[in-house]
Amino acid sequence: MNHDTHYNCKLQYDTVRFCTSSDNISLIKGKENLVKHTFDIETGEVTSMEFNSQANQANRNIVPFSLYIRVNMQSKRMIIEFSSKLLLEDYPLLISEDTFPQALRNMERLGICKLDVESIIEDCHFNKLHATKDVDMELTESILNTLNLYTGNYRKYKWIHYMNEGIC
């Protein structure tokens, strides 16, 4: 199969955000200072950890593109958001089902954390996907209603068919 054709028929994203278990991450010894920690005042236990590549110059020097990791120890959940630039030289392929594992492994190569890539792939739930091209599909009332549910401030928008070929 032609490599370009294979990737062009898949959904591709420029930015993704997903939620997974906090058990799927561990910090690398000696890199803890790159991560912001929040502590419970009474117990002294870490309640959350956060890495934001845009937070300061030191983080931007390590990760010159968008990467956000937030780990909540209390809820045992973790949110990760990154751009397709995490794919490095494969950036033009964008984030897809095929390149998502590579992006996670590249995140590990940054030296901030270790990830259980297989577990993340198994249990993650995406809550933000920036699509990079139109999706050809029939727009039914059910689909339009679902889009309303997944759109922030849904009361602000009214989905309507645009010349029977799209929505606005």
Where are these regions (language model features)?
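Structured, helix-rich domain cores that form ligand/interaction pockets
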Residues: 1-168
